[in-house]
Amino acid sequence: MSRQTATALPTGTSKCPPSQRVPALTGTTASNNDLASLFECPVCFDYVLPPILQCQSGHLVCSNCRPKLTCCPTCRGPLGSIRNLAMEKVANSVLFPCKYASSGCEITLPHTEKADHEELCEFRPYSCPCPGASCKWQGSLDAVMPHLMHQHKSITTLQGEDIVFLATDINLPGAVDWVMMQSCFGFHFMLVLEKQEKYDGHQQFFAIVQLIGTRKQAENFAYRLELNGHRRRLTWEATPRSIHEGIATAIMNSDCLVFDTSIAQLFAENGNLGINVTISMC
């Protein structure tokens, strides 16, 4: 199979855990949704979760909004620091919706699991995956590719599961990122080569692939990065990262293709470095 080659110019210096059911309130008691609505914060409309503090008149406000207020938003009375133990007991019997329910998450779960779930929820907003651009954009997963196509037009996209990622001018000083996109199997993958300069002047390169998709979707693929030339070969194989988790942690832990300047020079041609990239389905 012939490989496509494109030039990448320097750009600049789990799935949701299942809910655990708690004993349901039955008989003449209100439905779970009605009970959960009693815990809505009157300021941000998120949920007031234990420890629950009330004003002198019994009104509630969430822990995020409370430090920003000087009086109760409902009655304008003093906030006070009175624990509402009765509501805390009720909260232990309620299944709360995920804060990203409006984006499509249907999980309901005990308040003790809510924060951990929302940290990993795949319906939370995605950040722009483009490194080195200082882009602050956030949006839904479906909006990521349109954002990249309109706001980061310099990124080249190649079609096919077997391509060559050509990073130009790898001898540029300082920290530099090279980025390109690969489209295959109905998905888009972002290929990143990042050069970091350490405090002692030592430079390292980090190459990694991330899927424009969820963690669950990423588990269906594998990628191989290969430096090949002058009768030498250096290869890395792994599961692509989801843009949900990003690549910063993987690079920090060297969980990617890592090589220093001396290795790069063994494979470079006229200051340009070609990386063979192969995407396969598991």
UniProtKB/Swiss-Prot annotation:
**EC number(s) from the headed UniProt entry:** 2.3.2.27
Question: Which reaction is recorded as catalysed by this protein?
Answer: S-ubiquitinyl-[E2 ubiquitin-conjugating enzyme]-L-cysteine + [acceptor protein]-L-lysine = [E2 ubiquitin-conjugating enzyme]-L-cysteine + N(6)-ubiquitinyl-[acceptor protein]-L-lysine
Give the record's keywords alphabetically: Apoptosis, Cell cycle, Cytoplasm, Developmental protein, Differentiation, Disease variant, Intellectual disability, Metal-binding, Nucleus, Phosphoprotein, Spermatogenesis, Transferase, Ubl conjugation pathway, Zinc, Zinc-finger
Induction / repression: May be induced by p53/TP53, suggesting that it may be required to modulate p53/TP53 response. The relevance of such activity in vivo is however unclear and may not exist.
According to the record, mutating R124A results in: In D; does not impair its ability to interact with CACYBP and degrade CTNNB1 and PML
How activity is controlled: the entry says: Inhibited by interaction with SNCAIP (isoform 2, but not isoform 1). May be inhibited by interaction with PEG10.
Question: Which residue windows does the record flag with biased composition (Polar residues)?
Answer: 1-17
InterPro entries per record:
7-in-absentia-prot_TRAF-dom, SINA-like_animal, Sina-like_RING, TRAF-like, Znf_RING, Znf_RING/FYVE/PHD, Znf_SIAH
Single GO cellular component annotation? early endosome
Zinc fingers classed as SIAH-type: ranges = 93-153
According to UniProt, the tissues expressing it are described as: Widely expressed at a low level. Down-regulated in advanced hepatocellular carcinomas.
Q: Does the keyword Zinc apply?
A: yes
The annotated region (SBD) lies at: 90-282
Q: What is the effect of changing R76E?
A: Decreased activity
Which pathway is this protein engaged in?
Protein modification; protein ubiquitination
Annotated consequence of substituting L211R: Abolishes ability to degrade DCC
- Residue(s) carrying Phosphoserine: S19
What results from changing G174R? Answer: In BURHAS; loss of function in Wnt signaling pathway
In alphabetical order, the GO MF annotations are: identical protein binding; ubiquitin conjugating enzyme binding; ubiquitin protein ligase activity; ubiquitin-protein transferase activity; zinc ion binding
PANTHER family reported in the protein's UniProt record: E3 UBIQUITIN-PROTEIN LIGASE SIAH1, E3 UBIQUITIN-PROTEIN LIGASE SIAH2
Q: What is this protein called?
A: E3 ubiquitin-protein ligase SIAH1
Protein's organism: Homo sapiens
